[in-house]
Amino acid sequence: MPLLNSVTTPYAEALLQVVNENSQTEEMVSEVKQLLELVNDSPELEKALSSPILETDAKKKIIIEIFSNKVNSSLLNFLKLLADRQRIGILTSILDRFLEIYRENSNIALATVTSAVELTDEQKGLITKKIINIAGTEKLELVTKIDPSLIGGFVASVGSKVIDASLASQIRKLGLTLSK
């Protein structure tokens, strides 16, 4: 991915600079997350934006039509710039990189917690506190996923660290111990 990062980083940093100059950081981070979710949930939109067949003006028209009421003007202008520069096809990578740089600059760790069932707010709070201690950070962004194959418990990952407290893992370990 280093090659893609060399393309995405300048755009992500430019967006972050605009955001910081306009004191819109929290608002923009929220909008970028919503935009990423929207694009990731719509394969047709992603295909259209990355299509080499569609002209730049057509892509800009799509951007304006879909996003003009959903994002602020700075982000809308950024999307149009990406279309002009033929970079709208890597939009999700640029936005992911933007969030990555934002987290690095703000000392926010990103943790992914996968559980067998939906976690309650209390459980999320307890897991967040535990991960903050392990990660050695003051702030944490928690992404939750559901995987019924875990049977119970959870698997948390932050950076290169993984905490596997799932029932499926414990059953696997027990099976290995009994087979010896």
Swiss-Prot record:
Recorded superkingdom: Bacteria
Record keywords: ATP synthesis, CF(1), Hydrogen ion transport, Ion transport, Membrane, Thylakoid, Transport
First-listed, main subcellular location of the protein, grouped into a coarse class: membrane
Organism from which the protein derives: Prochlorococcus marinus (strain AS9601)
GO cellular component: a single term: plasma membrane-derived thylakoid membrane
Function: F(1)F(0) ATP synthase produces ATP from ADP in the presence of a proton or sodium gradient. F-type ATPases consist of two structural domains, F(1) containing the extramembraneous catalytic core and F(0) containing the membrane proton channel, linked together by a central stalk and a peripheral stalk. During catalysis, ATP synthesis in the catalytic domain of F(1) is coupled via a rotary mechanism of the central stalk subunits to proton translocation.
Membrane topology summary: Peripheral membrane protein
InterPro entries: ATP_synth_OSCP/delta_N_sf (IPR026015), ATPase_OSCP/dsu (IPR000711)
Gene Ontology MF term list: proton-transporting ATP synthase activity, rotational mechanism
Disulfide bonds: none
Subcellular location: Cellular thylakoid membrane
Family per record: Belongs to the ATPase delta chain family.
Name of this chain's protein: ATP synthase subunit delta
NCBIfam families linked: ATP_synt_delta (TIGR01145)
Subunit (UniProt): F-type ATPases have 2 components, F(1) - the catalytic core - and F(0) - the membrane proton channel. F(1) has five subunits: alpha(3), beta(3), gamma(1), delta(1), epsilon(1). CF(0) has four main subunits: a(1), b(1), b'(1) and c(10-14). The alpha and beta chains form an alternating ring which encloses part of the gamma chain. F(1) is attached to F(0) by a central stalk formed by the gamma and epsilon chains, while a peripheral stalk is formed by the delta, b and b' chains.
